[in-house]
Amino acid sequence: MENRRQGMVVYLHSLKQSKMLRKFGNVHYVSKRLKYVVLYCDMDQIEKTMDKIASYSFVKKVEPSYKPFLKLEFESKLDKAKEYDYKIGI
């Protein structure tokens, strides 16, 4: 059985405590310049985990990823300019 995962972005004041976030889920990426961590955890525990992480003093802001709720199948629409046949008169 596959667990549904959802990402979250944790903005930090300092990167010293970024290793501590490993206990909440999988740390996917740590940006040293912009001071944020991309973290993945189970979808059913995302709210509880976000509240717990936001309560720490070294955390500025926690934002969830909305990717699981977006439609990722796109329909191809033909371009209006390509739709017309310009070689009719020739």
UniProtKB/Swiss-Prot annotation:
Its main location: cytoplasm. Belongs to the UPF0298 family. It is found in: Cytoplasm. It comes from Bacillus subtilis (strain 168). This is UPF0298 protein YlbG. Coiled coil: none annotated. It comes from the Bacteria. GO terms for cellular component: cytoplasm. Keywords: Cytoplasm.
